Amino acid sequence: MDLQNQMKKAVAQAAVDQIQNGMILGLGSGSTAALMIEALAIKIKSGEIKDVVGVTTSFQGEVLASELGIPLKSLSSVSEIDLAIDGADEVNPKFQLIKGGGACHVQEKLVAALAKKFIVVVDSTKLVEKLNLDFKLPVEVLPSAWKQVQKTLINLGGEGNLRMAQKKAGPIVTDQGNLILDLTFRNGIDKPELLESQINNIPGVLENGLFVNLTDEVLVGKVESDVVGVESLKKI
């Protein structure tokens, strides 16, 4: 196992260690979240964790959790989530995130917003000083509106292109049946909170991948002297 995967596994385990019996859990999407789901399943099977139920943020996560025997509920059937654990594509020092590399950010944001505590689990490569310099900001749009939204985003200073599928002809289609515009700002994102609101106010936009004022804790996997460890970051 390479160092990056070791970091992901360590940080996923650290997050699972915070889970208590009887919790309703938000189970995130992506490679690190998948490791967290696997670690949770092991603890449930051993009896170390009991009476928990998960709410997944993607079809991928639902399939994995079901296969591993984790009890699940739909998002619409819960009014509150005790603890949500998810990864991120970028994290800045203020715990503001870009998510949506897996095109699941709408459900991910809904789950994070319902959570009493939202923990983000990442390896050290996801830490940045400024968002959007390296990773594009996903914006989920109605299929009939993507051209109009694309033009409006230009007025905000962003260049957005449809995310194309890798193993089928045409664009990526989300779990909600929508399209994704991946957005780049030449100098990165200066004011994430303002931009999140501006983008979501565009007609035809369902949600964007900026997560602002949602994250309670960031657990990061790090390597020092070839030893893998986990650090809980402090918000600036």
UniProtKB/Swiss-Prot annotation:
Enzyme class, first EC level, given as a word: isomerase
In its keyword annotation, does this UniProt entry include Isomerase?
yes
The record's GO molecular-function terms, alphabetically, read: ribose-5-phosphate isomerase activity
| Binding positions (substrate) | S29, G30, S31, T32, D86, G87, A88, D89, K99, G100, G101, G102, K126
Keyword match Isomerase: yes
| Catalysed reaction equations from the record | aldehydo-D-ribose 5-phosphate = D-ribulose 5-phosphate
Q: Which UniProt keywords apply?
A: Isomerase
UniProt GO BP: D-ribose metabolic process; pentose-phosphate shunt, non-oxidative branch
Q: Could you tell me what this protein does? A: Catalyzes the reversible conversion of ribose-5-phosphate to ribulose 5-phosphate.
Q: Which PANTHER family match?
A: RIBOSE-5-PHOSPHATE ISOMERASE
Q: Which HAMAP family match?
A: Rib_5P_isom_A (MF_00170)
Q: What is this protein called?
A: Ribose-5-phosphate isomerase A
